[in-house]
């Protein structure tokens, strides 16, 4: 005989527990007489610590290979990667105090006892290039010479003689210009530039008409061109006009109708 199931109505919602208590898998619901059921929660388990480095374990293999997880902030500020960074400051306890003098390290060429160390050869003295050393020596001598000259000391060395420059060929004197006697104001040593006391003025000859037309403008130049064309046409007509008259034409026809020119 089949067992008949009893129909139940809709379930009533459970009243919420006190604030701060969340029912978990390990919580127990207890009820007291004439009171609402109370929820006693067991201490929640601490979440698993995140992995030290690398992607979370729930990532796929592709994300584990290509996902970039930044490291701690202390690794980003590592000064060893930068060659020009200053050396790190020592700890407070490692810093030398005023009472305790800082020990001096021996030079690289000295041994533990203060003598020469055969493993480290002595460093060679620094030498300037020959050209720079020569220039430095000349500059030092020049400064010393100036210092002695300003102090007015006796026995100051003479300044170095300037290299002799090739003498420029003197220009031949023109016969029209008479030779002037040397005046006391003129220095005995010839200079490169000479100023003659005699001044000659040379007048430049220019075409007045061209200069006048240039001052007037283009319209005046065109008018002058038209006038010149009319003048030349009139001169040509005066020469060719007599040859085109009726008498000249009759003479030309008479010469052409002679027996020598007959067909």
Curated annotation (Swiss-Prot):
Compositionally skewed regions (Polar residues) per UniProt: 24-35
Subcellular location: Host cytoplasm; Host nucleus; Host nucleus, Host nucleolus; Virion
Region (10 X 3 AA tandem repeats of A-T-P): 161-190
Interaction with host PPP1CA: annotated segments: 190-203
Top-level taxon in the UniProt lineage: Viruses
UniProt keyword terms in alphabetical order: Host cytoplasm, Host nucleus, Host-virus interaction, Inhibition of host autophagy by virus, Inhibition of host innate immune response by virus, Inhibition of host interferon signaling pathway by virus, Inhibition of host RLR pathway by virus, Interferon antiviral system evasion, Modulation of host PP1 activity by virus, Repeat, Viral immunoevasion, Virion, Virulence
GO terms under biological process: response to endoplasmic reticulum stress; symbiont-mediated suppression of host autophagy; symbiont-mediated suppression of host innate immune response; symbiont-mediated suppression of host translation initiation; symbiont-mediated suppression of host type I interferon-mediated signaling pathway
Regions of compositional bias (Acidic residues) in chain numbering: 73-83
Biased composition (Basic residues): 1-14
Main location, first listed in the record: host cell
Region (Interaction with host EIF2S1/EIF-2ALPHA): 233-248
Coiled-coil stretches noted in the UniProt entry, renumbered to this chain: none
Similarity-based family: Belongs to the PPP1R15 family.
Description of how the protein assembles with itself and partners: Interacts with host PPP1CA; this interaction to forms a high-molecular-weight complex that dephosphorylates EIF2S1/eIF-2alpha. Interacts with host EIF2S1/eIF-2alpha; this interaction is crucial for the specific dephosphorylation of EIF2S1/eIF-2alpha by PPP1CA. Binds to proliferating cell nuclear antigen (PCNA), which may release host cells from growth arrest and facilitate viral replication. Interacts (via N-terminus) with host C1QBP; this interaction allows C1QBP to be recruited to the inner nuclear membrane by ICP34.5. Interacts with host PRKCA. Interacts with protein UL31.
Domain notes from UniProt: The triplet repeats region may play a role in modulating virus egress.
Protein name according to UniProt: Neurovirulence factor ICP34.5
Lineage: Viruses, Duplodnaviria, Heunggongvirae, Peploviricota, Herviviricetes
């Amino acid at each position: 005989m089949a067992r008949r199931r009893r129909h139940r109505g809709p379930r009533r919602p459970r009243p919420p527990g006190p604030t701060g208590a969340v029912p978990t898998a390990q919580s127990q619901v207890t009820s007291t007489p004439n009171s609402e059921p109370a929820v006693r929660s067991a201490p929640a388990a601490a979440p698993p610590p995140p992995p030290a480095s690398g992607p979370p374990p729930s990532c796929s293999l592709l994300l584990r290979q290509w996902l970039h997880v930044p490291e701690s902030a202390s690794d980003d500020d590592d000064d060893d990667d930068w060659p020009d960074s200053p050396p790190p400051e020592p700890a407070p306890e490692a810093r030398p105090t005023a009472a305790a003098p800082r020990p001096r390290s021996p030079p690289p060429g000295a041994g533990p006892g203060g003598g020469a160390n055969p493993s480290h050869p002595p460093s060679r003295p620094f030498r300037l290039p020959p050209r720079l050393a020569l220039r430095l020596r000349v500059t030092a001598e020049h400064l010393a010479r100036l210092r002695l000259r300003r102090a007015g000391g006796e026995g100051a060395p003479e300044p170095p003689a300037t290299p002799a420059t090739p003498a420029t060929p003197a220009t031949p004197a023109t016969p029209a210009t008479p030779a002037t006697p040397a005046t006391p104001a003129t220095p005995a040593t010839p200079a490169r530039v000479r100023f003659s006391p005699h001044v000659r003025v040379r007048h430049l000859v220019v075409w007045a008409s061209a200069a006048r037309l240039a001052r007037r403008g283009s319209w005046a130049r065109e008018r002058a061109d038209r006038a010149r064309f009319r003048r030349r046409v009139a001169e040509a007509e005066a020469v060719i006009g007599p040859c085109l008259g009726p008498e000249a034409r009759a003479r030309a026809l008479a010469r052409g109708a002679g027996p020598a020119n007959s067909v």
